[in-house]
A protein has these predicted regions:
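N-terminal hydrophobic/helix-forming segments and targeting peptides
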Residues: 1-183
Length: 183
């Protein structure tokens, strides 16, 4: 990655000056500032069958899951959690390795027993995008485990349990795909 350049080295820079209209003279004590690619997503490829966009990996999963819950049967409780920091190991307080989900479940259930019963009746699915086989570099993938672009969903397994996938969730997902006519 390239570090973004925002000014020449011989210039002075002050966040307080930059944000004067927002801070109205108050001192900025700390910041969480990031550079983001703000270009809109683009269709690409000879048949416009590929999407190119920044941050597509996690946002696609989150938007798809949210739309699914909004269209789901409301007689059954559903919970969607979209964690931060998946790309850096999920070990932050707002990542999947943090306590956020456990804390929320404790707040929305009556007692520990009902929380445990709810979890035992639940199915946890983690979603992500898979890196498809690039036709020019097929040897970068295992020969029997390479996702083919635009050929349907992929089920990811990890021996270190980095995904929520197990035989039960994989079987359930395959059954859902078959019933929806998805290969």
């Amino acid at each position: 990655d390239l570090v973004p350049l925002i000014m020449n080295a011989d210039k002075t820079f002050s966040l307080d000056t930059l944000f004067d209209d927002v801070t109205q003279g108050r001192e900025i004590l700390a910041t969480d500032l990031f550079f983001y690619d703000t270009n809109p997503a683009q269709m690409t490829g000879l048949k416009n069958d590929f999407i190119a966009s920044a941050r597509l990996d996690n946002l696609l999963s989150c938007v798809t899951a949210l739309n699914s819950i909004l269209e789901a049967d409301t007689s059954v409780s559903s919970l969607l959690i979209c964690n931060d920091h998946e790309e850096v190991g999920s070990a932050s307080t707002s990542g999947a390795g943090g306590t956020f989900l456990k804390d929320i479940l404790a707040r929305i259930t009556i007692d520990e027993g009902s929380k445990i019963r709810s979890i035992s009746r639940s199915l946890l699915i983690s979603t992500d995008n898979a890196h498809g086989v690039h036709p020019n570099y097929p040897k970068k993938h295992e020969s029997r485990h390479g996702p083919i672009l635009n050929k349907g969903p992929v089920i990811k397994f990890n021996a270190n349990q980095r995904y929520a996938t197990n035989s039960e969730t994989a079987g359930y997902f395959k059954t859902l795909c078959q019933s929806a006519g998805i290969e």
